[in-house]
């Protein structure tokens, strides 16, 4: 299930993005400040390049690139 980013409380969205950008394996040695990485993800969400995907089975939210989400979720 896709969750529109603008329907989340601002603090919830920020925490979700911060969790994503600080996960092991997402920085690839990049020493870009946290705030910059958060802004990049927020920009990708507003441009429609990334989406918030809620997996019903695992009950987890994930940030994903739009092209990585199965097409049936956009129908």
UniProtKB/Swiss-Prot annotation:
Domain of life from the UniProt record: Bacteria
InterPro entries, alphabetized: UPF0270, YehU-like_sf
HAMAP family, per database record: UPF0270 (MF_00690)
Homology family: Belongs to the UPF0270 family.
Annotated protein name in UniProt: UPF0270 protein PSPPH_1506
Organism: Pseudomonas savastanoi pv. phaseolicola (strain 1448A / Race 6)
């Amino acid at each position: 299930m896709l969750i529109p980013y603008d329907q989340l409380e601002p603090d919830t969205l920020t925490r979700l993005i911060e969790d994503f950008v600080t996960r092991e394996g997402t920085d690839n040695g990049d020493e870009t400040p946290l705030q910059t990485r958060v802004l990049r993800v927020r920009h990708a969400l507003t441009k429609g390049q990334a989406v918030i995907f809620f997996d019903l089975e695992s009950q987890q939210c994930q940030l994903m690139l739009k092209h990585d989400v199965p097409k049936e979720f956009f129908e």
